[in-house]
């Protein structure tokens, strides 16, 4: 939160130089919105345990900035990788939409709403929810596809493999459910 988060960018970077400076090379410019957004719900949980509302608010602010930056304004969904200067990336899969990025964003946004009441978090939760259920879900054989192309079309029909196992989706849906339950209890 104090090193890889760069206030001058409003974003979390993946790599820094030896003196924690921004580096102008492919690795130095690499952004992974999914990692940054996922990390923010971990920070929110930490803030809740510590009773540190300011930490929670900072995590929400960063998560919202990352979602906005990472959102594909042409086709929807969150990019897998980005370059902080908008330059070409060496990762060929940079523009794909991956299941784990989207489930982690659902968790982060509903937790952000639960812990702060921030309406932007709820709006992002709804936006991501709509994208997920209209693009990742297989209506014939329920479970999520893991990999979509930039346009939101299924790239691979497999639903499990080396990287996509039985972790992100069930854990994510459980986290979302628990947050929604707590939100409902507050409004009863």
Where are these predicted regions, by residue range?
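Glycan-recognition and catalytic cores of secretory/periplasmic carbohydrate-active enzymes
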Residues: 1-188
